[in-house]
């Protein structure tokens, strides 16, 4: 079931380095929110904090609150592994398990959770591959290695793997940056379909992509080298691209910097 995300006064640190300052925003359920901004502005750092993936970096910590339907994902006793099951991640480059079969790639998470029923695994594999618009392309070779698929197919396989464990939120960190234009269009169409069932947050450097797929857009910027990234503004995507409130947003979207 898609859930709402709320960030309140979020500050992110890596050791003594203050990476992101004072972020507050809300992501409605069944909505695509795009994070845009120049390199180093903190958008991917914020994205990774939404399911505690940034914690794999030593010294990382978050101050403030990140709430999933009102529950603080950094609260006492909250298991990061459980958070990452509820809030899935699709990375910049397709990362299927290359020697594992297509089917086993999809159900790897379920197997880690102890699922052993072949019927259940088969059902989830088909449902997830259909959900990722990949089923018709791979249904006759489910036992073949996932690494043998094209780049675009591999990324859709990774999306199928992410949705197989029934998350509430999907995070996508530049999911099309390594893909050709045709594969990119397929992923964008898929994102539009997936938002019927999931809350989606996507980081992208592609302004046209943000305008095409997102319902709201958040613009992040960096004041200066060594300073933390900040959220400049967030609004409906149409307004951000046609009539932004902040001059920095307009300058970035129009290509004056970034």
From Swiss-Prot:
One example of a Gene Ontology biological process annotation: phosphate ion transmembrane transport
Membrane topology (UniProt): Peripheral membrane protein
One GO cellular component, as annotated: plasma membrane
Pfam families with a match to the protein in the record: ABC_tran (PF00005)
Ranges where the ABC transporter domain occurs: 5-247
Annotated positions binding ATP: 37-44
The protein's Enzyme Commission number: 7.3.2.1
Disulfide linkage: none
Homology family: Belongs to the ABC transporter superfamily. Phosphate importer (TC 3.A.1.7) family.
Subunit structure, interactors included: The complex is composed of two ATP-binding proteins (PstB), two transmembrane proteins (PstC and PstA) and a solute-binding protein (PstS).
PANTHER family attached to this UniProt entry: ABC TRANSPORTER I FAMILY MEMBER 17
Name of the protein this chain belongs to: Phosphate import ATP-binding protein PstB
Organism of origin: Rhodococcus jostii (strain RHA1)
Lineage: Bacteria, Bacillati, Actinomycetota, Actinomycetes, Mycobacteriales
Gene name in the database record: pstB
